Amino acid sequence: MSATLPDVAVTEPSTLSAPLRWVGMQDIAIPVQLEAGGGQLAARASVQVDLPRAELKGIHMSRLYRLLDTQLQQPVSPAMLSGLLQALIESHADCASRAARLTLSGELMLRTPALRSEGLSGWRAYPVHIAAQCSAGRTTIQLQAEVLYASTCPCSAALSRQLLSDAFVQQHAGRDALALDEVAQWLQDHGSYATPHSQRSVAQVRVELPADAQRLAIRQLVGLCEQALATPVQAAVRRPDEQAFARLNGANLMYVEDAARRLRQQLAEHYAAFHVAVRHLESLHAHDAVAETDSDDAVLGPTTM
């Protein structure tokens, strides 16, 4: 029996000679350790290098996998990702590789407190996406996160208030004065005479980290988005929390345009390059309302929404 196993990727030339922009693997199941306190992702990874040597039959997939498996046992940081990309390129020096890219996708599990009930909290899952690329000696790292929130239509709210006002006037026509407790009781009985439509909504944001970034800070990105929107969906709730959520929605009426602009203003204070895509799953319509915006110098392209 021969002691040497054949390696046709090395010994047999390609019958079709052409360089390839990217070659590698995708949808690799792998656990990813985030920064201290950031938790762990049950992630799916994609990893590729370029293949400039047109005559070679293929790259060495196992080298990519082993590097990924070894390096991702340590917490992910910008420095770690930059080092991993360089190692991927160097592992294919015999292919003359000069570029590498890596994506990590998964759901970040965060425990979120209830709005009012002390000691009550629940889990939220946030889809996140980390993309790192090294090409021509330059490394870029992008983060993408998805946040769910509630949006209440400003127009529908105004129409509902008008109906409520008209009903109040009609039922109290001819009366010059009303006692405070009488008005309060009428509102208690008829305050839902008309209600504005609201819906679960989705925001996807992608940012490019500055070259000197020390941390990924995914939790910070999620927090910035939820702070800007003010109405993130909740996990565990009791009646006081549901009432507080209703108050937040009333204080933050939003068209899809408003949501996109809120996020743009918030992200512009922290990132030089970003892209925002929002989608309101309309309860009034059978279609969705969408909006996109980005930084003035963004070259990130659309999100994956």
From Swiss-Prot:
InterPro entries: GTP_cyclohydrolase_FolE2, GTP_cyclohydrolase_FolE2/MptA. Keywords: Hydrolase. The keyword Lipid biosynthesis does not apply. The keyword Cytoplasm does not apply. Pathway: Cofactor biosynthesis; 7,8-dihydroneopterin triphosphate biosynthesis; 7,8-dihydroneopterin triphosphate from GTP: step 1/1. The record marks 153 as: May be catalytically important. Converts GTP to 7,8-dihydroneopterin triphosphate. It holds the Pfam family GCHY-1. It is an enzyme of class 3 (hydrolase). The gene is folE2. Its EC number is 3.5.4.16. This is GTP cyclohydrolase FolE2. Gene3D superfamilies: Urate Oxidase. Belongs to the GTP cyclohydrolase IV family. GO terms for biological process: tetrahydrofolate biosynthetic process. One of its GO terms (molecular function) is GTP cyclohydrolase I activity. It comes from the Bacteria. It catalyses: GTP + H2O = 7,8-dihydroneopterin 3'-triphosphate + formate + H(+).
